[in-house]
Curated annotation (Swiss-Prot):
The lineage of its organism: Eukaryota, Sar, Stramenopiles, Ochrophyta, Bacillariophyta. It comes from the Eukaryota. The keyword DNA-binding does not apply. This is Small ribosomal subunit protein uS4c. NCBIfam families: PRK05327.1, rpsD_bact. Keywords: Chloroplast, Plastid, Ribonucleoprotein, Ribosomal protein, RNA-binding, rRNA-binding. Transmembrane segments: none annotated. It comes from Phaeodactylum tricornutum (strain CCAP 1055/1).
Amino acid sequence: MSRYRGPKLKISRRLGTLPGLTTKKSNKLNRPGKDGNTDIGKKLTEYGVRLEEKQKLKFNYGLTEKQLFRYVKEARRRQGVTGLILLQLLEMRLDTLCFTLGFAKSLAQARQLVNHGHITINKKVVSIPSFQCRLNDIISIKEKSSSKTLVETNIKNNQVREIPTHLRFDTVKLEAIVLDYCDRNDVSLQLDELLVIEHYSRR
């Protein structure tokens, strides 16, 4: 199953605010559907609620179904709180960290920066958006990168958003170091990750 490339506002109207998908807000208050009234009087089943939480995670991080299931399996395999571990795995992706640091306005743009070879880890170019960063990794913009101006502009526009404490960012060098794994409070996406784990419990 391929990654979603359709209208982003339609998804955010249906699922709520998804900071990784888009920062734009729709003028339409109702969920998508005929006259915006398809959900009136309807109550989601337990399965429907779990599915919706899964969809939030999938669309926010720009994942395919196969990718998300793989992250869930890896989170189950590790010791600790499975839901938090799942979020930590997603937040330690290189594209997610670039977005969190303000290098890009969305995860899709962050993914492009990585794909085009503009991001380095420990001074080496890494062009894989799903690359799992580790503690003490140093993330920076490639020297003489054509995207440096774009990144600088995005950082200025993103100054409202605080850099989480598990990252340390040098705005002069455009360089960050991963100090720790994120806490639940560091994840801006509003969802119940336990329901996502439950959704995949029979697989």
